[in-house]
């Protein structure tokens, strides 16, 4: 029974819901009014009933006409880049841009074809002495040269054995009487001498036995004078030999040398300024090299080549510019200047040097050059 009542109530409720839905649908389609919503007959028919409950929501109506477009919203965030599209057509050529910076230098190109030879330039100054080259192969023997000039007198040799007695010489001139010597001890009686000067007559004696005739004696005074002259000559020779030997010892301090004629050029291989070089040679009993002929210049050149150093000569023009003289003041009797020399370059070249090619050049005296002395 109770179940029946509940079922009826549910059905009634559903009926009211459908009715309400129909009314809402109708109200949306027609203009609502107080009469249509509340009353179905005139007011005079009776009192209005109580408001019923809202019915169930009716079915969804048809889609209405589109409304007016709303205002544009704000731009959203940019999306991700899309895929690259196909290449477009080439645009028109633009105006040239500003000049760019200079790029790095490229690698050097191959050498070009040699150009034609230029004109020969002027002759340059003589360069410095180069290093001594290696000795070349030994050449063939040349023709025999001329006999050279006699060399200097050599030092005295050792005393030889006594030679055989020579022939009697011619009596010399009478010398001055010498001083009386001290009386010597009595010697063995010699042979009878020649008769002395006649003495004063004595008392007449008894006649004696005649003696044997003695040999004729030699004259004394001429022989003494000759011996004195010989001794003096020997003393001079000894003095000359002593001086020569003393100079020879000094010369031997210079190990390298060349002789020509009566001259010897010597060097010890060291270099000095002109004034000091001059002093070294003077103390050794000589002077700086002073070649007075082509032969002497060639001999000096051999020393310069062996040492591979230019050497000072003794000549200067310190007294008169351009006029070179020997240390004695004499003018030059021989010269072998290089082309364009002397030129007094810099206004201070008052001394002379000799190169390995034998040519001369004026040089400042303060420079250091090889010391070569002449004896």
Curated annotation (Swiss-Prot):
GO CC annotations, alphabetized: collagen trimer; extracellular space; multivesicular body
Biological-process GO terms, alphabetical: innate immune response; lung alveolus development; positive regulation of phagocytosis; regulation of immune system process; respiratory gaseous exchange by respiratory system; surfactant homeostasis
Domain C-type lectin stretches: 260-374
GO molecular function: carbohydrate binding
CDD domains: CLECT_collectin_like
Family note: Belongs to the SFTPD family.
Protein name: Pulmonary surfactant-associated protein D
Organism: Macaca mulatta
Species lineage: Eukaryota, Metazoa, Chordata, Craniata, Vertebrata
Gene: SFTPD
């Amino acid at each position: 029974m109770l179940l029946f009542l509940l079922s009826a109530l549910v059905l009634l409720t559903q009926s009211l819901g459908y009715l309400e839905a129909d009314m809402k649908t109708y109200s949306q389609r027609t203009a609502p009014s107080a009469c249509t919503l509340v009353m179905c007959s005139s007011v005079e028919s009776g009192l209005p009933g109580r408001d019923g409950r809202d019915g169930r929501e009716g079915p969804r109506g048809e889609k209405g006409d589109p409304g007016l477009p709303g205002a544009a919203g704000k731009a959203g965030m940019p999306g991700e880049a899309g895929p690259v599209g196909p290449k477009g057509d080439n645009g028109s050529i633009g105006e040239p841009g500003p000049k760019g910076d200079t790029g790095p230098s490229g690698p050097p190109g191959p050498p070009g074809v040699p150009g034609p030879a230029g004109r020969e330039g002027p002759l340059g100054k003589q360069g410095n002495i180069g290093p001594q080259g290696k000795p070349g192969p030994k050449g063939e023997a040349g023709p025999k040269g001329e006999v050279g000039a006699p060399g200097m007198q050599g030092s005295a040799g050792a005393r030889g054995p006594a030679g055989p007695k020579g022939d009697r010489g011619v009596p010399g001139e009478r010398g001055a009487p010498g001083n009386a010597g001290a009386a010597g001890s009595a010697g063995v009686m010699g042979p009878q001498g020649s008769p002395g000067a006649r003495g004063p007559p004595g008392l007449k004696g008894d006649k004696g036995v005649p003696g044997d005739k003695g040999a004729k004696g030699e004259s004394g005074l001429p022989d003494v004078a000759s011996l004195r002259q010989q001794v003096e000559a020997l003393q001079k020779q000894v003095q000359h030999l002593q001086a020569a030997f003393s100079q020879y010892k000094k010369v031997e301090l210079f190990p390298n040398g060349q002789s020509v004629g009566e001259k010897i050029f010597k060097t010890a291989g060291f270099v000095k300024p002109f004034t000091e070089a001059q002093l070294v040679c003077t103390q050794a009993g000589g002077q700086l090299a002073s070649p007075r002929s082509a032969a002497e210049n060639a001999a000096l050149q051999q020393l310069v080549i062996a040492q591979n150093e230019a050497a000072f000569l003794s000549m200067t023009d310190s007294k008169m510019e351009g006029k070179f003289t020997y240390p004695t003041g004499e003018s030059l009797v021989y010269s072998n200047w290089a082309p364009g020399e002397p030129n007094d370059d810099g206004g201070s070249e008052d001394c002379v040097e000799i190169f390995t090619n034998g040519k001369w050049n004026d040089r400042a005296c303060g420079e250091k050059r090889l010391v070569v002395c002449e004896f």
